[in-house]
Amino acid sequence: SLVGSEMCIRDRCINEGEVSNRLGLSGISPIAEKIIIERDLSLLSEFPCRYHINQISSQNSLDVIKKNKLNGKKFSVGVSINNISLNENDIGDFKTFLKLSPPLRLEDDRKALVEGIKNGLIDVIVSDHTPEDEESKRLPFAQAATGAIGVETLLPLALELYHNESLPLNKIVECLTINPSNILKINKGTLKKGSDADICVIDLNKPWVVKAGNLKSKSKNTAIEDKRLQGKVLMTFLKGEPVFKI
């Protein structure tokens, strides 16, 4: 599995381009990600195995993935909710809570990734939940810890793409439930008879504002503080037993 940290050179978790130049930070080119994917997919031809690309972030990577899937190679692909909801401009002036791995890319990359979900090139949307203490995120950008929490905001951010008509609801559900379960070969992700009764009850339209202090996570390093969202989980059942309720 190719994970985000393999795509990130130390102290370079910002996209290489206009924003990195303006902020005076060392950037990481999307070509680095593309090269790793090309390498691994070449190895897949020689050594067939189950292979999952955990998080891609660029149009360049999608081009490689499309070519290989059209050639019949079997593998799965994931993308972080951050990379389909935000772009490098959201970093503004050194917003370290948006230092992520893989880094936020161009708006064109974000749109391409959303399209990749829609056409089936990307199979899974992940939270990239990376807890860090706030002090480690409040350092100068190059020294700040990488990552953001994401479990509680994964679904609402994904629903934003539904509300703005970027993605159909069934595709979002598929990428959050059915596909991950199929990849992991576990009996979850559907409501069919015999499946584990892991169920979320959702209000698709409930408005709320992200406040780190109100999140359940012990770590509070959210990348979307004060963001207005629409849609929230009201109840969660695990194997039929209620484990969460607002």
Describe the predicted segments one by one:
Residues 13-14, 66-71, 217:
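Short, solvent-exposed amphipathic alpha-helical segments in soluble enzyme
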Residues 10-18, 89-94:
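Short, flexible, mixed-charge acidic loops at enzyme active sites
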Residues 1-4, 8-9:
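Single conserved hydrophobic/aromatic residue that forms the stacking wall/gate
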Residues 21-32, 98-108, 145-149, 222-228:
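A short acidic, glycine-rich active-site loop
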Residues 5-6, 40-56:
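Divalent metal-dependent hydrolysis catalytic cores, especially in the metallo-beta-lactamase
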Residues 50, 54-156, 160:
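Active-site neighborhoods of metal-dependent hydrolases
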Residues 140-143, 196-246:
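C-terminal cap of metal-dependent C-N hydrolases
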Residues 20-48, 116-125, 130-204:
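His/Asp/Glu-enriched, well-ordered alpha-helical/loop segment
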